Amino acid sequence: MNGTEGPNFYVPYSNKSGVVRSPYEEPQYYLAEPWMFSCLAAYMFMLIVLGFPINFLTLYVTIQHKKLRTPLNYILLNLAVADLFMVICGFTTTLVTSLNGYFVFGTTGCLVEGFFATTGGEVALWALVVLAIERYIVVCKPMSNFRFGENHAIMGVAFTWIMALACSVPPIFGWSRYIPEGMQCSCGIDYYTLNPEFNNESFVIYMFVVHFIIPLTVIFFCYGQLVFTVKEAAAQQQESATTQKAEKEVTRMVIIMVIAFLICWVPYASVAFYIFTHQGSDFGPIFMTLPAFFAKSSSIYNPVIYIMMNKQFRNCMITTLCCGKNPLGDDEASTTASKTETSQVAPA
C-alpha cells in the first residue's frame, strides 16, 4: 500500500519515514507546502463570498415576486437551497480546515462536511434528472394533455431530496464512511479502501450505479429524444414560432446546466473511480484535491446560468436590488409574453 490507513482516515502518503500524522490532530504540511493550503482557503473564501449572496438572492427575489413562483422554478430554486446548505455547512468548515492545514473539527466535523457536500451534489444531479424528464414530457409529448403543475413540481423536489439522502445518509450509519481526502482538508466517501468493516466496496458500486450512471443515462436519453423532436417539429412547423422559441430557450438553459454539472463533477467521479479500481496505486494528495475542490464550484454556476438565461428573473432581480424600480426599463409584458403555457418559465 502506498498510503497510510488509520482510524477514520486514509492519507495518500507512505509512513515508511514515520512522518504521517492523523489529519484530525496535526497539520499535514508533509503532503504539500503551506502556501498550497492557503490557496485552498482563499478558493473556499471566494466560493463563500460568491455562493452565499447569489443563492440567497435567488431565493429572496423569488419570494418577493409572485410571478416567479411557477412549477418549473420550484425545481430550479431547490438547487439554490441545496447550494446554500453546501456553502453554510460545508464550505465554511473547509475554509477553517484549510487555514489550519488539517481537519480541526475531528471526525464529527468530517461527517458533517462530507454529508452536505455529497447531499448538495446529489440534489443537483437528481434535480437535473427531474428537469430532463419535464423537458421530455413537455416537448416530446409522450403523454397527451399532460401539464407540469405545482403538485408535480413538489413531488419532483421531494424526489431529489429522497434520492440525495439515499446516497449521503448510509455512510453516517456505517455503510461506508466519510473520511478526509486529498490534502485532508475536505471530506468525502471512502473510495480509498476496501474496509470490510464498513462494506466500502458494495457502497461505492451502489453509489456509482444508482447515483451516477443511471441518472446520467436518463438525462442523455431524454435530451436525445428532445433534440430529435425539436428538429422534427421545426421542420413540420407543428407549433407557433413563439412557442417553439420559448421551449427551445428553456431547454437550452437546462442543457447548459447539465453540461456545467458534467464539467464540475465528472473529473471528481473519474478520479474517485480510478482510485477505487486501483487500490494501493501510487497517487499524490493533489491528485484528488484538485477535482474535489473544483466540484465545489457547482454551488455557483446554477444560479448564474439561471440569472443569465432567464429574462423575467433578471428583471425581477434588478427591480429588487434597485428598491422597486428597474433602471433598464425593460417591459415586463414583453417578457411574460414569451412564457410558454407548458413550462411556465420565461427564458431570455
Swiss-Prot record:
A motif ('Ionic lock' involved in activated form stabilization) lies at residues 134-136. Photoreceptor required for image-forming vision at low light intensity. Required for photoreceptor cell viability after birth. Light-induced isomerization of 11-cis to all-trans retinal triggers a conformational change that activates signaling via G-proteins. Subsequent receptor phosphorylation mediates displacement of the bound G-protein alpha subunit by the arrestin SAG and terminates signaling. Glycans are attached at N2, N15. The chain crosses the membrane at residues 37-61, 74-96, 111-133, 153-173, 203-224, 253-274, 287-308. GO terms for molecular function: 11-cis retinal binding; G protein-coupled photoreceptor activity; metal ion binding. This is Rhodopsin. It comes from Sminthopsis crassicaudata. The modification N6-(retinylidene)lysine is found at K296. SMART domains: 7TM_GPCR_Srsx. Disulfide bonds join C110-C187. A lipid is attached at C322, C323 (S-palmitoyl cysteine). Residues 1-36, 97-110, 174-202, 275-286 are extracellular. Belongs to the G-protein coupled receptor 1 family. Opsin subfamily. The gene is RHO. It holds the Pfam family 7tm_1. Residues 330-348 are annotated as: Interaction with SAG. PROSITE patterns: G_PROTEIN_RECEP_F1_1 (PS00237), G_PROTEIN_RECEP_F1_2 (PS50262), OPSIN (PS00238). It is a multi-pass membrane protein. Its main location: membrane. The modification Phosphoserine is found at S334, S338, S343. Phosphorylated on some or all of the serine and threonine residues present in the C-terminal region. Contains one covalently linked retinal chromophore. Upon light absorption, the covalently bound 11-cis-retinal is converted to all-trans-retinal. After hydrolysis of the Schiff base and release of the covalently bound all-trans-retinal, active rhodopsin is regenerated by binding of a fresh molecule of 11-cis-retinal. Homodimer. May form a complex composed of RHO, GRK1 and RCVRN in a Ca(2+)-dependent manner; RCVRN prevents the interaction between GRK1 and RHO. Interacts with GRK1. Interacts (phosphorylated form) with SAG. Interacts with GNAT1. Interacts with GNAT3. SAG and G-proteins compete for a common binding site. Interacts with PRCD; the interaction promotes PRCD stability. Forms a complex with ASAP1 and ARF4. Forms a complex with ASAP1, RAB11A, Rabin8/RAB3IP, ARF4 and RAB11FIP3; the complex regulates Golgi-to-cilia rhodopsin/RHO transport in photoreceptors.
